[in-house]
């Protein structure tokens, strides 16, 4: 019995030592802000009417961070919002100062950018010359319109090259908008053998690997779904600690609100037999009753897929093409990013191809250009989802819906064939990825012109005409 009591006492002392009381404040313009959520990555608290918060911080905590309220922004340092402070058991306090976010209340645009992934100085120079000007044009346009804008980089910010973190961060800081980070598998230090050690470089530049912030009427949650084992070995999984943290956060949200969960690896790989991440299922259950969106990268392809009722995943194509090797992604999606908008509670998205007009959302091939469908017009609609309609007109006459099919992208296939013909070695991740956002229609022998019209779920209409070359 004595030994048991000693054991229980030791456990209680250990538990007491596992948390330390901390204190801090949240202000805006020097005035206290109440009701702001604060977390150590394990538990939550809120600031009171004087803007003061207290929290028993876990000894394993790495940061004390705010859930930035809608309509406010933490000061930027190198483009990164400073909504966090490194946890220091000896610190006397954690004081945060927020600022109002100018622009129409509740309206914003979010640039979701996947896998910039420079590995070499050459890649970095190309990031600067090929990718950043198009992103800069998008944010410059937003400033001209007076729009609130932010960016989120969906992991693989670098490609096993932590020495490039500072340069990439500086490039994104140049956009002049808050930039939120997501950690990817290639952002881990491959020379470390625990997940905590392997994220140290990333955390030094971008802060916590999981956190939350609000914009408009949407609650954004960023998670780390890469469990790293060292030497490039990892699992696509959300660890138990983060799941508990997210579930506790879910309990604090208003019923029926919108939640966007940003991670690197997708929750569901719809193109691989709906192969899902088990932990993501638990996450969806935790946020049941909310409108849920996953925003992910990692795959170098583009997909908008309804995982279950009320849950949509936006898997965003790689912004630099396929690993800087190819001019488009291996599913045929152009280099680009997903642009999310919210205003007055209305939430929408649209793919933006780098250097192209927003109106460019489809690509059409003539009969005879696609070997698998030699007599058909073939259209690619890379941001398609099941709520789109894709119809066609022949010489101005409506002909109905086109037939959806799965294809290797003709342009990407031609590119790879040209590399092979030139004697180039092709990586296994350069194989064309069959995708189901292609549509076919067979025009009549006398047809002179075909128009393809694609309309997205928000009623936006995109079209492309081709002349078939018949003469009298």
Task: Show where each model-derived region lies.
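N-terminal active-site segment of His-dependent metallophosphoesterases
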Residues: 21, 28-29, 68-166, 446-449, ...
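Short, ordered, surface-exposed loop/turn motifs in non-cytosolic proteins
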Residues: 20-23, 27-42, 59
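Extended active-site neighborhood of metal-dependent phosphoesterases/phosphodiesterases
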Residues: 70-76, 83-86, 162-255, 274-295, ...
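Short, acidic Ser/Thr/Gly-rich low-complexity loop/linker segments typical of extracellular
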Residues: 42-56, 404
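Binuclear metal-dependent phosphoesterase catalytic core
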Residues: 311-395, 436-444, 449-465
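Hydrophobic beta-strand segments
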Residues: 36-40, 63-64, 390-392
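Short acidic, glycine-rich surface-loop motifs adjacent to enzyme active sites
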Residues: 250-271
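Aromatic sugar-binding surface patches on proteins
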Residues: 177, 409-440
């Amino acid at each position: 019995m004595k030994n048991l009591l000693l054991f229980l006492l030791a456990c209680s002392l250990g538990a007491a030592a596992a948390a330390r009381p901390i204190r801090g404040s949240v202000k805006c313009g020097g005035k206290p802000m109440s009701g702001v959520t604060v977390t150590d990555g394990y538990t939550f608290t809120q600031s009171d009417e004087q803007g003061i918060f207290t929290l028993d911080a876990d000894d394993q905590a790495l940061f004390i961070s705010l859930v930035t309220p809608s309509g406010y922004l933490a000061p930027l340092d190198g483009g990164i919002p400073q909504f966090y402070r490194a946890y220091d058991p000896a610190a006397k306090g954690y004081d945060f100062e927020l600022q109002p976010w100018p622009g129409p209340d509740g309206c914003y645009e979010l640039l979701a950018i996947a896998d910039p992934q420079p590995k070499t100085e050459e890649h970095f120079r190309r990031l600067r010359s090929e990718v950043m000007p198009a992103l800069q044009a998008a944010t410059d346009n937003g400033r001209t319109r007076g729009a609130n804008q932010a960016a989120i980089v969906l992991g693989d910010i670098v490609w096993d090259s932590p020495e490039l973190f500072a340069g990439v961060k500086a490039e994104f800081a140049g956009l002049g908008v808050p930039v939120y980070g997501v950690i990817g598998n290639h952002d881990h230090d491959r020379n470390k053998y625990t997940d905590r050690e392997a994220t140290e470089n990333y955390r030094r530049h971008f802060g916590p690997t999981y956190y939350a912030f609000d914009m408009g009427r949407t609650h954004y949650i960023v998670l780390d779904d890469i469990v790293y084992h060292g030497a490039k070995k990892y699992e696509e999984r959300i660890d138990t600690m983060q799941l508990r943290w997210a579930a506790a956060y879910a309990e604090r949200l208003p019923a029926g609100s919108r939640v966007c969960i940003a991670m690197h690896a997708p929750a569901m790989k719809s193109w691989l037999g709906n192969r899902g991440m088990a932990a993501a299922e638990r996450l969806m259950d935790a946020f049941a009753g909310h409108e849920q969106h996953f925003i992910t990268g990692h795959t170098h392809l583009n997909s908008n897929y309804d995982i279950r009722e009320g849950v949509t995943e936006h898997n965003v194509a790689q912004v630099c093409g396929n690993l800087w090797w190819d001019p488009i992604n291996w599913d045929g999606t152009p280099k680009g990013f997903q642009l999310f908008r919210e205003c007055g509670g209305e939430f929408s998205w649209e793919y933006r191809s780098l250097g192209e007009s927003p109106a460019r959302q489809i690509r059409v091939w003539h009969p005879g250009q696609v070997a698998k469908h030699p007599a058909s017009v073939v259209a690619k609609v890379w941001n398609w989802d099941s709520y789109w309609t894709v119809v066609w007109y022949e010489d101005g006459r409506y002909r109905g819906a086109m037939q959806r099919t799965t294809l290797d992208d003709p342009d990407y296939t031609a590119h790879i064939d040209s590399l092979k013909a030139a004697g180039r070695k092709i990586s296994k991740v350069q194989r064309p990825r069959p995708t189901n956002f292609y549509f076919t229609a067979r025009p009549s022998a006398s047809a002179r012109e075909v128009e393809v019209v694609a309309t997205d779920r928000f009623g936006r209409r995109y079209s492309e005409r081709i002349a078939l070359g018949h003469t009298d």
